[in-house]
Amino acid sequence: MRTRTPVPFKNQLISAVVAGLLPVCASAGKDDNTLVVAFEKPLTTVDRLYSIQREGLILSRLTDDGLFYVNPDSLEFEPLAAESYEWINETTLEVTVRDDVFFHDGSKLTAEDVVYTFEWVLDENSDTSRGPVIQSWLESIEKAGPRTVRFNLRLPYPMALRDMAISIPVRKKGTYEGADGMENAAEDRPLNGIGPYRIKDFSAGREIVIERFDNYYQASPKANPAIETMVFRVIPDQGTQQAELLSGGIDMMMGVPPDVADNISHLPGVERKEGNDIRIGYITLDAAGYSDPDTPFTKLKVRQAINHAINREEITRYLVRGSAEVVPYACHPRQFGCEGDGPVYPYNPEKAKRLLKEAGYPDGFAFKLWAYREKIIAEAVVSDLKEIGLDVDLRFVKLNVFAKVRNDKDMEAFFASYGSGGTADASASTGVHFAAGSARNYTDDEALGETVLAAERTIEVAERKRLYREALNRIAEQAYWVPMFSYSQNYLLSPGLEFPVPKDGVPRFWQASWSDQ
């Protein structure tokens, strides 16, 4: 596959019209220390306990704190509202709660609030978005001292700190109960968080305004954010976002496609930044024969041929672009445990043809490749596969259709991506896709499933690394996947906005500031 993709004419036209008709104004909020950011998708709640959207995660990191947080530099899980923690044994975790943390209503955070929060999540009737996940590993929580809480786990679970950091913001005791609570936990009203910003105004599906919380605890790594007010405007159409950025209506666009970023970043009043993302693209092959017991993909040499046939380097360089890189194994290179030393499959179409012949398919065969995103990349894959004699029918469908067919185990091959929830740990990628019983697992490899499960049932670092290496090598040896590439994130900013690009694709806006220039 050799291609240099031209910028689509539609995007050229949009930029030409926008540049010609809209004045390039001062930033939306520099003069009054306000930051205005475009959200592509609406939020119906500001409560992270009832939202799984990426936008909800971004907002929650401003308005909420959990006991732990993701260090933006190391991507490791470290204490936040927790002062310290200790593993008493593999299934008992004790956490000391800080004594200088205040809710936005002025009340002080207590151990009772932490117990209340997790008991609410453990209550099946609360219907929290991550409740089933937490309930799968957490048996109970209890107050063990004036500022100490004890977590009693059902089993050893190394990602407990991750779940607390990403999914469970601390709530004040009684938030969801009684006359002072909320009858509908996800209804359109602000919540009482402990983050560096508090909700000032929330119009569901339209706009969220937050303001700096001056009584935020100084020991936090999020303390003293520079920007006083932030506004998140819901603007689903990227063309409209471009117009707003150029006219000064917003200060930032996120998740900008490379061709759009190429096209308008050279205009005055626009700055471009590129960063990494934990998301990876991959192709799954039906090695188990779920879709058809006679599918050629049950043969190892066929799967190896597919791996050699796809020019991942050029797809990554010319189509994904930015900071994207080819990934050799079934995980993101920045994730803990993503250290395989098994076989890799360099682009070699002639070897791919030989392998097909050895597998009994000298003239190739026909199959459907399913996809739901990045059609141009899926088309490039199809082009490469046709070069080795395969008759590939690209079935490009919407995500809901794709998910149903995939979950029904009725795909011979599919191209997809996975963001691991922004988690820098192989359990969120390798573990999700190759666990026994996973709808994403098309291997029927019981030993592999046991290996990834074992890696999620020990808190010993060295043992986890060994188990993930074993799993990744097995996946590579059997060519169950075609690991493709990591993704690159593009951001378009107003001049003068200082914004550290995140390593995991999840912006930390408390780090943003306006320069004096």
Residue ranges, per PLM feature:
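N-terminal lobe/hinge region of extracytoplasmic solute-binding protein
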Residues: 38-88, 119, 192-194
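Surface-exposed binding/hinge segments that line
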Residues: 4, 10, 86, 132-176, ...
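Ligand-site clamp/hinge motif
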Residues: 185, 215-263, 391-393
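A structural "hinge/loop" feature
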Residues: 41-57, 80-81, 107, 130, ...
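Aromatic- and charge-enriched surface segment that lines or borders ligand/interaction sites
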Residues: 83-127, 144, 150-152, 244, ...
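Gly/Pro-rich hinge or "lid" segments in bacterial periplasmic/extracellular proteins
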Residues: 71-72, 165-225, 229-231, 349-350, ...
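Structural transition elements
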Residues: 196-197, 292-293, 325-358, 376
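Detector for C-terminal structural segments
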Residues: 43, 203, 207, 276-281, ...
